[in-house]
UniProtKB/Swiss-Prot annotation:
UniProt xrefs under SMART domains: EFG_C (SM00838), EFG_IV (SM00889)
Organism: Methylobacillus flagellatus (strain ATCC 51484 / DSM 6875 / VKM B-1610 / KT)
Residues of the tr-type G domain: 8-290
Name the UniProt record assigns to this protein: Elongation factor G
Entry binding sites for GTP: 17-24, 88-92, 142-145
Function of the protein: Catalyzes the GTP-dependent ribosomal translocation step during translation elongation. During this step, the ribosome changes from the pre-translocational (PRE) to the post-translocational (POST) state as the newly formed A-site-bound peptidyl-tRNA and P-site-bound deacylated tRNA move to the P and E sites, respectively. Catalyzes the coordinated movement of the two tRNA molecules, the mRNA and conformational changes in the ribosome.
Cellular component terms per the entry's GO annotation: cytoplasm
Signal peptide: none
């Protein structure tokens, strides 16, 4: 089966934005203009195609990244057909993990900003993630029809807040109620869309006289940006003062893919204006799978390997998302980097070392699925029938294994105890939770050994609320949820050397294990590190793994209040053994005893999670908000002015002080402030706080 669309005409893009920038409405319009949906779904009515989980439709926010495939021939239908795979990513800070995982498989992104709200804190988080993965992107300023809309202010904000380099390729004609269309700076024509056809039809007209100077000024900036792409273009521009349409597009494309600039467009998705021109920009400026560097991985023995985006290469793909579907069971979304995969084939999961058979392959268009025979390099699709695959694992051909770089998922910072309302639901709840944990790696489930309660952990209160909600809807399990608990940690402050000796003589074979270890603080975020420095066989080789195991088993419960110990380096440097009585268990016990003793002597401290909090508030309430944050042991980091008045206050606050903050901030500001928070780092808890926690235990 030949490829319908050449890979050069593929675009794998994400649409990413702050919560209310109108991202889902923008995605909807894309699907409407590309002919995937025939009726426009509005988030306002809770009927958007890409928001297909019930909670998303109720809450009007997007939680999971749906992957949708559509085709576009250009606004004037004059181009060859391009295939666009869109991943709609959530904007809420509790779902940052979803953004992170979709950035990994995208080739380009379209950032949607609100013309009134501008660049908001969540946009900065997403921007940082896109920088980290070097994702080329363009910006779309939406909601130009709203009161207070200001396109040029958002351009300035992108420079200030994101250190971006935005290059407008269109500018708006009018704003607010008078927003009529856009000026295309490449063609130097005004574009007006026809309301009766819901924006399907449009016409080019001359630029309104009062906008001509502004248009010329911005066109010059754009042409200069394009000319900087190469010496050849720069020389031509300096000689003639002009570049052709094709040269401008080529220059801007080259610099966008190199992440040096971000082309900028604007419109109003709700009023059916501007999204069509943005789709053209996706074709013009964002890369196809061939335009970006080859994907990098390693062989099973650790040598670096690359794979070209080519059907003739060996097959490699990344499973970037799992979803349980009521009709077909588990859907595994994969991004194919190289080669071809046909349904019914067996592939190799190089991360886990298991073989998997692909049952069926489906292409998703939001919530409809079309079965297909095969997927090729550059495709994004969902596979059915993969039992053992989890998020972030590599699938590849059996004969030519490659392990692509794994995704790194953040540790959860908040936990709650959960129990089913009826005893009969216990088993169902276990099943539901393990299925949800498989889908979402930033969500964890464990059983507390002391209380036998089921504990679920995640990235924030909203994250866990939605998990409990999904359990009820998708698995019919009603649950009671306890008060949120903070994930504290323990660490040591000074190096110590300690010995652990485990000797047991009670008739028959005895037990003997003896170790000397040095414990010292490790760099923050390094975790546990074990170093073997045994010389002259004082601890025999075969028992050294047992020492490491004994330490690992002791680490999950520290000496202060039983919290996991982090960032500790342990060096085994001496010990002794008995020819007959020494065994693995004895050395495991000796290591565990030494570790506990060392913890007590090494100035143990309690660490608490600190959150980066950003509150956007009208100026009148600024003092109250700052006072309240300080009373929560918050440290104010700085303040920014917001577009359209108001302040954004940035602070670092311990998570334990942030429970129920939503209610407080609402009453302090009469509901006019919004806030977001994300995990920043662990820090030592003050003595009085630590004592209270230890005494509670």
């Amino acid at each position: 089966m030949a490829r319908k669309t050449p890979i050069e005409r593929y675009r794998n893009i994400g649409i990413s934005a702050h919560i209310d920038a109108g991202k889902t409405t923008t995605s909807e319009r894309i699907l409407f203009y590309t002919g995937v949906t025939h009726k426009l779904g509005e988030v306002h009515d809770g009927a958007a195609t890409t928001d297909w989980m019930e909670q998303e439709q109720e809450r009007g926010i997007t939680i999971t990244s749906s992957a949708v495939t559509c085709f576009w021939k250009g606004m004037d239908l004059s181009r060859p057909e391009h295939r666009i795979n869109i991943i709609d990513t959530p904007g809420h800070v509790d779902f940052t993990i979803e953004v992170e995982r979709s950035m990994r498989v995208l080739d380009g992104a379209c950032m949607v900003y609100c013309a009134v709200g501008g660049v908001q804190p969540q946009s900065e988080t997403v921007w940082r993630q896109a920088n980290k993965h070097k994702v080329p992107r363009l910006a779309f300023v939406n909601k130009m029809d709203r009161t207070g809309a200001n396109f040029f202010k958002v351009v300035e904000q992108m420079k200030l807040r994101l250190q971006a380099n935005p290059v407008p390729v269109v500018i708006p004609i009018g704003a607010e109620d008078n927003f009529a269309g856009v000026v295309d700076l490449i063609k130097m024509k005004a574009i007006y869309w026809d309301d009766a056809s819901q924006g399907m039809k449009f016409e080019y007209k001359d630029i309104p006289a009062d906008l001509l100077d502004t248009a010329n000024e911005w066109r010059e900036k754009m042409v200069e940006s394009a000319a900087e792409a190469s010496e050849e273009l720069m020389n031509k521009y300096l000689e003639s003062g002009e570049l052709s349409e094709a040269e401008i597009i080529a220059g801007l494309r080259q610099r966008t893919i190199a992440t040096e600039i971000q082309p900028m467009l604007c419109g109003s998705a709700f009023k059916n204006k501007g999204v069509q021109r943005m789709l053209d920009a996706v074709l013009d400026f964002l890369p196809s799978p061939v335009d970006i560097p080859d994907v990098v991985g390693e062989s099973e023995s650790g040598e670096p390997l690359t794979r070209k985006a080519d059907d003739n290469e060996h097959f490699s793909a990344l499973a970037f998302k799992l979803m349980s579907d009521p009709f077909v069971g588990q859907l595994t979304f994969v991004r194919v980097y190289s080669g071809v995969l046909t349904k019914g084939e067996t592939v190799y999961n190089s991360t886990s070392g298991r073989k998997e058979r692909i049952g069926r392959i489906v292409q998703m268009s939001a919530n409809e699925r079309n079965e297909i025979e095969e997927i090729r390099a550059g495709d994004i699709a969902a596979c059915i029938g993969l039992k053992e695959v989890t998020t972030g694992e590599t699938l590849c051909s059996i004969d030519h294994p490659i392990i692509l770089e794994r995704m790194v998922f953040p540790e959860p910072v908040i936990s709650v105890a959960i129990e089913p309302k009826t005893k009969s639901d216990q088993e169902k709840m276990g099943l539901a939770l393990s299925r949800l944990a498989q889908e979402d790696p930033s969500f964890r489930v464990r059983t507390d050994e002391e209380t036998n309660q089921t504990i679920i952990s995640g990235m924030g209160e909203l994250h866990l609320e939605i998990i409990v909600d999904r359990m009820k809807r998708e698995f019919n399990v009603e649950a009671n949820v306890g008060a949120p608990q903070v994930a504290y940690r323990e660490a040591i402050k000074k190096p110590v050397e300690v010995e652990g000796k485990f000797v047991k003589q009670s008739g028959g074979k005895g037990q003997y294990g003896h170790v000397w270890i040095k414990m010292e603080p490790n760099e923050p975020g390094k975790g546990y590190e074990f170093i073997d420095q045994i010389k002259g066989g004082t601890v025999p080789r075969e028992f050294i793994p047992a020492v490491d195991k004994g330490l690992r088993e002791t680490i999950p419960s520290g000496v202060l209040a039983g919290f996991p110990v982090v960032d500790v380096k342990v060096t085994l440097f001496d010990g002794s053994y008995h020819d007959v009585d020494s065994n693995e268990n004895a050395f495991k016990m000796a290591a565990s005893m030494a570790f506990k003793d060392g913890m007590r002597k090494a100035d143990p401290v309690l660490l608490e999670p600190i959150m980066a909090v950003e509150v956007e508030t009208p100026e009148d309430y600024m003092g109250d908000v700052m006072g309240d944050l300080s009373s929560r042991r918050g440290v104010i980091q700085g303040m920014d002015d917001l577009v359209g008045g108001g302040k954004a206050i940035r602070a670092e606050v311990p998570l334990s002080e942030m429970f129920g903050y939503a209610t407080t901030v609402r009453s302090l500001t009469q509901g006019r402030a919004t806030y977001s928070m994300e995990f920043k780092h662990y820090a030592e808890a003050p003595r009085n706080v630590a004592e209270a926690i230890i005494n509670k235990k």
